[in-house]
Amino acid sequence: MSKISKIKAREVLDSRGNPTIQVEVWTEAGGHGSAIVPSGASTGTREALELRDGGTVYESNWFGGKGVQTAVDNVNNKIAVLLKGHCVLNQRKLDNMMLQLDKTENKSALGANAILGVSLAIAKAAADELKIPLYRYLGGTNAHQLPVPMLNVINGGEHASNTLDFQEFMIMPLGAKTFKQALQVANKIFHTLAKLLKKAGHGTQVGDEGGFAPNLKSHEEALDFLVKAIEEAGFRPATEGENAVAIAIDAAASELYHDGIYTFKKLKKAIEEKRQGFEPTRVQFTTEEMIQYFGHLFHTYPIISVEDGLAESDWKGFVRFTQKFGKTHQIVGDDLTVTNAKILAEAIEKKAINSILIKLNQIGTVSETLDTIELAHKAGYTTVISHRSGESEDTTIADLAVAVNAGQIKTGSLSRTDRIAKYNRLLAIEEAIQSTAQYKGEKVFFNIKK
């Protein structure tokens, strides 16, 4: 039995310069694993709690209350004591021991960031001890599918200080034959988009996830730029066929929702400030009008997927949205389901979505994440493994995407090392598994008819 000999946590910084937690685990046989926990900007209300130092003894003089020293202390003084001497290969048992120590529904006692850091580092230490890569340890011999990347080339919402209310405008290289080719396609489109934005007088500053963050007058203008960039790069803006590149949107609509009304707040502010080029236009929508708005976008642009098109509390709206468009489009739940198997079960029963976004830190352990993915796949749902806006050099999600044959991954644009690190890891995995590697492209959408 390979026993854990040491667990050590420390405070480090994420891609926004905010504190996060890094955990290292060592075993008696020489295994070692290290993990850095990500952090989100637009978060679901039912996510597991990310423990920060606000309200603790650290608040007044440590990162303005955003520090994670409390979570670090919980790892070093509580979790480490509990888990030392236990077999590193028993992931589920160790995860359950931490959950029993915490004793809360949302992991607020120890902090989901503390628990997840340990859970991830344990998995990596186990893989290291067995001398196998993480994707093979988590997925076994069946781990072979490289994910179609959703590349967030235009940022908005909480991820950028611009005028776009929708959070992410993404491209999906569906016509590529391999993951490496998909990145080559994306690279060409990304740099073509930069030239088009410059030519139109826009800056090419980037948002939290590495995509451009121009001050555009509407979501349609952002989509027009994407279509033009795809075409000028030599590809087809389409959801299927040769050289097809489709578009995906993350509306992050919970950020826009209040008292039953969706408001494009950034656009509204730009109009009220009478900024140049911003003409009066509609900025408020009911649920039914939002669904109709997406219908207009679907009819006009090659959009294949929408994430959080409605607010997390608008369950009836999600059901209507999926009834209307779920047979032809991927309707992804993120804030709605927060990688929680219990909530996903409710969504499956109500037929509220047909796809789920998977974020490790929304639920807080490797075991619970795998349970949610398994439930989604059994229900015939697609799964999208996702980063957070606050990231690091940690590449765990790349291995996870291959381990569970998720088929899709969201990990930002083709800039910022914290995003590129995941793509580079996937390139290495594709090379390592060579002839058994699969990239499904448009076939990844097995549960819809385009």
Curated annotation (Swiss-Prot):
Domain of life where this protein originates: Bacteria
Record keywords, A-Z: Cell adhesion, Cytoplasm, Glycolysis, Lyase, Magnesium, Metal-binding, Secreted, Virulence
Main localization of the protein described in the UniProt heading: cytoplasm
Binding-site positions, (2R)-2-phosphoglycerate: Q167, K359, R388, S389, K410
A GO term for molecular function: magnesium ion binding
Catalysed reactions, as listed in the record: (2R)-2-phosphoglycerate = phosphoenolpyruvate + H2O
Gene Ontology biological process terms in this record: cell adhesion; glycolytic process
Gene Ontology CC entries for this record: cell surface; extracellular region; phosphopyruvate hydratase complex
List of catalytic residues: E209 (proton donor), K359 (proton acceptor)
Cofactor note: Binds a second Mg(2+) ion via substrate during catalysis.
Localization in the cell: Cytoplasm; Secreted; Cell surface
SUPFAM superfamilies cross-referenced by the UniProt entry: Enolase C-terminal domain-like, Enolase N-terminal domain-like
InterPro entries given in the database record: Enolase, Enolase-like_C_sf, Enolase-like_N, Enolase_C, Enolase_CS, Enolase_N
Keyword field contains Lyase: yes
Pathway: Carbohydrate degradation; glycolysis; pyruvate from D-glyceraldehyde 3-phosphate: step 4/5
Task performed by this protein: Catalyzes the reversible conversion of 2-phosphoglycerate (2-PG) into phosphoenolpyruvate (PEP). It is essential for the degradation of carbohydrates via glycolysis. 'Moonlights' as a plasminogen receptor and plasmin activator. Contributes to host (pig) cell adhesion; anti-enolase antibodies decrease binding to porcine kidney cells about 60%. Binds host plasminogen and fibronectin in vitro; enhances the activity of host tissue-specific plasminogen activator (tPA), and helps plasminogen and tPA degrade articifial host extracellular matrices.
Family recorded in the similarity comment: Belongs to the enolase family.
Remaining remarks: Pathogens have evolved a strategy to activate host plasminogen and manipulate plasmin activity for their benefit; plasminogen binding (even without its activation to plasmin) increases their adherence to host cells. Plasmin activity leads to degradation of host extracellular matrix proteins like collagen, fibronectin and laminin, facilitating bacterial dissemination and disease spread. Enolase is not the only protein in this bacterium that binds plasminogen.
Protein name: Enolase
Organism, scientific name: Mesomycoplasma hyorhinis (strain HUB-1)
